[in-house]
């Protein structure tokens, strides 16, 4: 019988001695349409092997804990699966750098800092994410909007100070938003309004989890379960089981 995946475990977990720190601090390359990119190191928290062959690896990414549970693919042993899970965590850390608005060196931060009306070069990876974000905005008629950075900053400030923003402040923030006012094409992005700031937090973890799943499958690990604490994705079920068993507390 496959083990239960406990969805609330991340609230109580502690940092265990990492038996595979060197594996989680993996440096490799992401290969695909974007070309090659160095993978950043990942803060290791724990890795464990179960009697049924399952490998569980946890790492600190995107300000939270990502957990990858996986079974070795054909011709692999547990060590191979452990290494590949570490690569998947490093993949998430790589995309965090692509999508981060807090990292002053990121392409998104440079786009946020640029004046409106100016064409700003963006990397193929950032362009991919921005185009997907705009697709989501169109599909939801703006319910999802990657340009809401000014509103997010305003309400974070309001919460910190314990004072509601004034109507004028809200109107000012809203005028700087609007996904229709962002143009992305041919490696360039243009903001059509002053003060616009992009925030991809509404899709970042889910996007990273999708890329992790792609990497695991490419490396030959098809039976896996990824948990980013807010987004989960299951691959093929554990060997001999109809699916992954979840327990929600």
PLM features: what roles do these ranges have?
Residues 2-249:
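Mature catalytic core of soluble alpha/beta enzymes
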